[in-house]
Curated annotation (Swiss-Prot):
Gene: mdh
Family: Belongs to the LDH/MDH superfamily. MDH type 2 family.
Keyword Thylakoid: no
Protein name according to UniProt: Malate dehydrogenase
Coiled-coil segments: none
EC number: 1.1.1.37
Entry keywords, A to Z: NAD, Oxidoreductase, Tricarboxylic acid cycle
Active-site residues, Swiss-Prot/TrEMBL: H190
């Protein structure tokens, strides 16, 4: 018997990441090859953006995806999020020239407060929310705080791009296969302060830490490369990472919805005090997902170097949150 379609809302749907994302969702890559989807696509009310969205929808039609059960264009989150089962919040205010970080936080606080309130009012009570738009952790925190009637645990931020970037660097360094890496994680904020941690990781069943055995490379090459990869891509491409961000969003949602088969993945999730992270902060943790739920991997030893890195990314996140508290 065929499954009932689920509703997937995507914001910033006509943007670069949206364009790299929608066709993969419609083809079944995110929720499975047997799960029909209805796409509820949100763009800003601007005429140009809405016209671009219509063009994307024409292309989606022209793909004749068997799993695409319907699609809708919206300019208001109150209609775009109606009964939605999954919400990918991709659209955010990018940092413009001469813009201070505080201005960026304030502009995004406005967007994500409105979207959180709309989700709270009209979305499915079990909606799974992934925030992709930066600053992702803080935007997820804002949306979560604006949706008091929804479970806080259902608001997540994307750290999977950092996770995937770290995995690629490790595979290149060790000569191993990226698909054979397990127990890698990224702690903290989706920003250059993130801490990609391979102390527990294996590649082809062998310890990554032992294979690399180079703390100088870890601190001076690996972590800066992963942390500043987004900036390096903008420098090279003239545009920010879109296809790789969309790919990470698919990975994050697929594992959350369908399970990670016992493997560690990284998600930005609200802390309940694990590893000394204050409750409610949306922080990157190692998680295992099963039956639509994620569980933080607990009991890992945090050495002095790791604690220092975790403290640094936590301090940045607390600074961001303090910067938006008065707006919530």
């Amino acid at each position: 018997m065929s499954k009932k379609p689920v509703r997937v809302a995507v914001t910033g749907a006509a943007g670069q990441i949206g364009y790299a994302l929608l066709f993969r969702i419609a083809s079944g890559e995110m929720l499975g090859k047997d799960q029909p989807v209805i796409l509820q696509l949100l763009e800003i009310p601007d005429e140009k953006a809405q016209k671009a969205l219509k063009g994307v929808m024409m292309e989606l039609e022209d793909c004749a995806f068997p799993l695409l059960a319907g699609m809708e264009a919206h300019s208001d989150p109150m209609t775009a999020f109606k009964d939605t089962d999954y919400a990918l919040l991709v659209g955010a205010r990018p940092r413009g020239p001469g813009m201070e970080r505080a201005d960026l936080l304030a502009a995004n606080a406005q967007i994500f407060t409105a979207q959180g309130k709309a989700l709270n009012a009209v979305a499915s009570r079990n909606v799974k929310v992934l925030v992709v738009g930066n600053p992702a952790n803080t935007n997820a925190y804002i949306a979560m705080k604006s949706a008091p009637d929804l479970p806080a645990k259902n608001f997540t931020a994307m750290l999977r791009l950092d996770h995937n970037r770290a995995a690629s660097q490790i595979a290149a360094k060790t000569g191993g296969k990226v698909g054979e890496i397990e127990k890698l994680t990224v702690w903290g904020n989706h920003s250059p302060t993130m801490y990609a941690d391979y102390r527990f990781a294996t590649i082809g069943g062998k310890s990554v830490k032992d294979a690399i055995n180079d703390q100088v490379w870890n601190a001076d090459v690996f972590l800066p490369t992963v942390g500043k990869r987004g900036a390096a891509i903008i420098e090279a491409r003239g545009l920010s990472s879109a296809a790789s961000a969309a790919n990470a969003a698919i990975d994050h949602m697929r594992d959350w919805a369908l399970g990670s088969n016992g493997k560690w993945v990284t998600m930005g999730v609200p802390s309940k005090g694990e590893y000394g992270i204050p409750e409610g902060i949306v922080f990157g943790f190692p998680v295992i997902t099963e039956n639509g739920e994620y569980k933080i991997v607990e009991g890992l030893e945090i050495d002095a170097f790791s604690q220092e890195r975790i403290n640094k990314t936590l301090a940045e996140l607390q600074g961001e949150q303090d910067g938006v508290k008065h707006l919530l």
